[in-house]
Amino acid sequence: MGNTSSERAALERHGGHKTPRRDSSGGTKDGDRPKILMDSPEDADLFHSEEIKAPEKEEFLAWQHDLEVNDKAPAQARPTVFRWTGGGKEVYLSGSFNNWSKLPLTRSHNNFVAILDLPEGEHQYKFFVDGQWTHDPSEPIVTSQLGTVNNIIQVKKTDFEVFDALMVDSQKCSDVSELSSSPPGPYHQEPYVCKPEERFRAPPILPPHLLQVILNKDTGISCDPALLPEPNHVMLNHLYALSIKDGVMVLSATHRYKKKYVTTLLYKPI
């Protein structure tokens, strides 16, 4: 009761607002508790913003990691030849590409050979010859910190560009061969033998459409003399010979390249 006058004076100095009381533990009483908008969505974001951002960040990092993994395509395996020329009875190959497990090599005359499909990159290997580990001194080597000497090989894509080009060409040739393949049926290697009566037969009559040779036609006045009329398709890829005149023989052949026709003339003196 004795503090009533002092509280009034303090209240007047603060504009008429009463300061909330605190208990001995430092908290405010329930009746004097300040009003904080805890039910407001802005206050909720204020207290829980860090908790919400953390899982979003983890999800983004995981998504980014998946993209990086997908972008890294596996290296293509390339056939690689390993050869041991130092002799021996039993030769094995071990390397970083097979977890250093022993792989037997195949004897080829005086050498031992193995062909493995290795991914592009750097690989170390070693030979196990008649119970002894050794390396090939004629090939590149690398020495580890412990003093172990291994052979090293670089599998590069550029080393196989020629083989890739040949493979593409072979695929194109195989596609053409499928279109121009022979019909099914029995075949043999025996040459055709002419019968006696066939030797005295007259040659077959020339088909009439082959008589219309371009070189035997007159060029129209309205046409360019340097250009020939479009030939018939049956005249393509045939060799024609004109009558010998003034001691010169003229040979001609017409070929088609897409929509263009090219006629080649060969003049041969007799």
Swiss-Prot record:
<dbReference type="InterPro" id="IPR037256">
    <property type="entry name" value="ASC_dom_sf"/>
</dbReference>
<dbReference type="GO" id="GO:0005634">
    <property type="term" value="C:nucleus"/>
</dbReference>
<feature type="modified residue" description="Phosphoserine">
    <location>
        <position position="108"/>
    </location>
</feature>
<feature type="modified residue" description="Phosphoserine">
    <location>
        <position position="96"/>
    </location>
</feature>
<keyword id="KW-0275">Fatty acid biosynthesis</keyword>
<feature type="modified residue" description="Phosphoserine">
    <location>
        <position position="182"/>
    </location>
</feature>
<keyword id="KW-0519">Myristate</keyword>
<feature type="modified residue" description="Phosphothreonine">
    <location>
        <position position="148"/>
    </location>
</feature>
<dbReference type="InterPro" id="IPR050827">
    <property type="entry name" value="CRP1_MDG1_kinase"/>
</dbReference>
<dbReference type="GO" id="GO:0007165">
    <property type="term" value="P:signal transduction"/>
</dbReference>
<feature type="modified residue" description="Phosphoserine">
    <location>
        <position position="6"/>
    </location>
</feature>
<dbReference type="Pfam" id="PF04739">
    <property type="entry name" value="AMPKBI"/>
</dbReference>
<dbReference type="GO" id="GO:0035878">
    <property type="term" value="P:nail development"/>
</dbReference>
<feature type="modified residue" description="Phosphothreonine">
    <location>
        <position position="4"/>
    </location>
</feature>
<feature type="modified residue" description="Phosphoserine">
    <location>
        <position position="40"/>
    </location>
</feature>
<keyword id="KW-0276">Fatty acid metabolism</keyword>
<keyword id="KW-0449">Lipoprotein</keyword>
<keyword id="KW-0444">Lipid biosynthesis</keyword>
<dbReference type="GO" id="GO:0005829">
    <property type="term" value="C:cytosol"/>
</dbReference>
<dbReference type="GO" id="GO:0006633">
    <property type="term" value="P:fatty acid biosynthetic process"/>
</dbReference>
<feature type="region of interest" description="Disordered">
    <location>
        <begin position="1"/>
        <end position="43"/>
    </location>
</feature>
<feature type="region of interest" description="Glycogen-binding domain">
    <location>
        <begin position="68"/>
        <end position="163"/>
    </location>
</feature>
<dbReference type="GO" id="GO:0031669">
    <property type="term" value="P:cellular response to nutrient levels"/>
</dbReference>
<comment type="function">
    <text>Non-catalytic subunit of AMP-activated protein kinase (AMPK), an energy sensor protein kinase that plays a key role in regulating cellular energy metabolism. In response to reduction of intracellular ATP levels, AMPK activates energy-producing pathways and inhibits energy-consuming processes: inhibits protein, carbohydrate and lipid biosynthesis, as well as cell growth and proliferation. AMPK acts via direct phosphorylation of metabolic enzymes, and by longer-term effects via phosphorylation of transcription regulators.</text>
</comment>
<dbReference type="GO" id="GO:0005654">
    <property type="term" value="C:nucleoplasm"/>
</dbReference>
<dbReference type="InterPro" id="IPR032640">
    <property type="entry name" value="AMPK1_CBM"/>
</dbReference>
<feature type="modified residue" description="Phosphoserine; by autocatalysis">
    <location>
        <position position="24"/>
    </location>
</feature>
<feature type="modified residue" description="Phosphoserine">
    <location>
        <position position="101"/>
    </location>
</feature>
<feature type="modified residue" description="Phosphoserine; by autocatalysis">
    <location>
        <position position="25"/>
    </location>
</feature>
<comment type="subunit">
    <text>AMPK is a heterotrimer of an alpha catalytic subunit (PRKAA1 or PRKAA2), a beta (PRKAB1 or PRKAB2) and a gamma non-catalytic subunits (PRKAG1, PRKAG2 or PRKAG3). Interacts with FNIP1 and FNIP2.</text>
</comment>
<feature type="compositionally biased region" description="Basic and acidic residues">
    <location>
        <begin position="21"/>
        <end position="36"/>
    </location>
</feature>
<feature type="modified residue" description="Phosphothreonine">
    <location>
        <position position="19"/>
    </location>
</feature>
<feature type="lipid moiety-binding region" description="N-myristoyl glycine">
    <location>
        <position position="2"/>
    </location>
</feature>
<dbReference type="GO" id="GO:0031588">
    <property type="term" value="C:nucleotide-activated protein kinase complex"/>
</dbReference>
<dbReference type="Pfam" id="PF16561">
    <property type="entry name" value="AMPK1_CBM"/>
</dbReference>
<comment type="similarity">
    <text>Belongs to the 5'-AMP-activated protein kinase beta subunit family.</text>
</comment>
<keyword id="KW-0597">Phosphoprotein</keyword>
<dbReference type="GO" id="GO:0120162">
    <property type="term" value="P:positive regulation of cold-induced thermogenesis"/>
</dbReference>
<feature type="modified residue" description="Phosphoserine">
    <location>
        <position position="5"/>
    </location>
</feature>
<keyword id="KW-0443">Lipid metabolism</keyword>
<dbReference type="InterPro" id="IPR014756">
    <property type="entry name" value="Ig_E-set"/>
</dbReference>
<dbReference type="GO" id="GO:0005737">
    <property type="term" value="C:cytoplasm"/>
</dbReference>
